[in-house]
Design a protein with these regions (language model features):
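N-terminal cap/lid segment of alpha/beta-hydrolase-fold proteins
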Residues: 1-28
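Short beta-strand element of the alpha/beta-hydrolase
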Residues: 31-40
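Glycine-rich "HGGG/HGxG" loop immediately N-terminal to the catalytic nucleophile
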Residues: 47, 71-81
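Short amphipathic alpha-helix adjacent to the substrate-entry channel of hydrolases
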Residues: 48-65
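Alpha/beta-hydrolase active-site loop
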Residues: 81-98
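Alpha/beta-hydrolase fold nucleophile elbow
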Residues: 101-112
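Short glycine-enriched nucleophile-adjacent loop
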Residues: 115-126
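Conserved small/polar residues in nucleotide/adenosyl-binding loops
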Residues: 143-145
Length: 145
């Protein structure tokens, strides 16, 4: 597949930690709706046989953002499992929506840990417009976020 461009971009969180995202854009005039995956396995997981390659989504008119969560991949900080995800997820949603390439619409996708990150966010934050979690077997009421 071709017809898209990608680049890495850093989000500086309020606590000073930097999260790294890889962003794919269509070769057409934006802004576009964004699809976001936040994950701990390295940004390259988004372009394996596990998921449709970001270029496929780009060919459908979406910008795609794949982010390494705190302390994993190229992102800074310490990975503490699920404890930091509500705050980091909310700040990431706000950041993606503020990017000049994004039209303000935000969808989330992924399974397992990537599914979990879709279900977190601070109570006072704006929710995503669409989400698609899968294989996320957890009881969120048992997690103290």
């Amino acid at each position: 597949m071709s017809g898209s461009k990608w680049f890495d971009k850093s989000l500086l969180l309020r606590d000073g930690v930097s999260l790294i995202s890889r962003i794919w854009l269509p070769n057409s005039n934006g802004p576009w709706p964004a699809l976001l995956m936040r994950q701990p396995y390295g940004r390259e997981i988004a372009s394996t046989i596990t998921y449709s390659h970001p270029e496929w989504w780009v060919s459908k008119g979406y910008m795609v953002v794949i982010q390494d969560v705190r302390g994993m991949g190229a992102s800074e900080g310490v990975f503490n499992g699920f404890k930091q995800e509500a705050r980091d997820t909310s700040e990431t949603h706000e950041w993606v929506r503020s990017l000049k390439e994004c039209n303000g619409k935000l969808g989330l996708y992924g399974f397992s840990y990537q599914g979990f990150t879709q279900l977190t966010g601070e109570l006072n934050s704006k929710p995503p417009d669409c989400l698609s979690p899968a294989m996320t077997g957890m009881n969120l009421s048992l997690i103290h976020i």
